[in-house]
Amino acid sequence: MLVLAVLALAGLLAATASASARPVTAADRALLARPATAEEHVAERVAERLTGHEQIAVRCGNTGVPDPHVLGATPMQNGHAFDYFLMRPAECTYLTWFHDAPKRWDPRTCVASDCGYVFEIAWALQTVAHESYHLVGYTNEAQVDCYGMQSIWFVASRLGASVAEAQALAALFAQRIYPLRRTETPAYWSPECRDGGAYDLRPAGHAWPS
């Protein structure tokens, strides 16, 4: 099931997390004006821990980016973010599924009917991490995507996964999804995204990507 899912995913890699260099819009203000949903609170708590920022807002809705395949967006102006990011509603749903039953989505043990969603779960975890690094101030998509991949384990563990499962999800992304970036979405790929590379967040260790 996992191999088939990977092959199907190869044609969908235009679905990427993205930073949008634009100011706050009226649509953003409308989303931010309403209370966060339970799903959005889940993403907010993880993003706050990952960035060290307080009162980050995450909203699920229109990302404000024309490409319908974009999973998330962090509005920025003059290189500065606004301490909020947007995700597609589907990503919030996947995060909630994972938070409610982490073991169900373990790529090593999932049943066939659930394994078909494990890649979507991994994308949702990576989207939170990816956009969080934009909030910190990083704008290079290849660098941000690499950092996000290396933080999948953190997001997964904060949502209740065991260390082993969190690392397995990160490895799944690194081994099965990230290599396809090179040809499908090259702006999000870098040869320095590797153990010991320039974008290695933990060069002293070798448990790549975790």
Predicted regions and their residues:
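Regulatory and partner-binding modules of innate immune sensors/adaptors
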Residues: 7-9
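Intrinsically disordered, low-complexity acidic Ser/Thr-rich regulatory segments
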Residues: 111-122, 126
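A metal-dependent hydrolase signature that marks the N-terminal structural subdomain at the beginning
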Residues: 2, 11-114, 208-210
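Active-site recognition of the HExxH zinc-binding catalytic motif
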Residues: 122, 126-141, 145-149
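Metalloprotease/metallohydrolase-associated module, dominated by Zn2+-dependent proteases
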Residues: 21, 29, 47, 54, ...
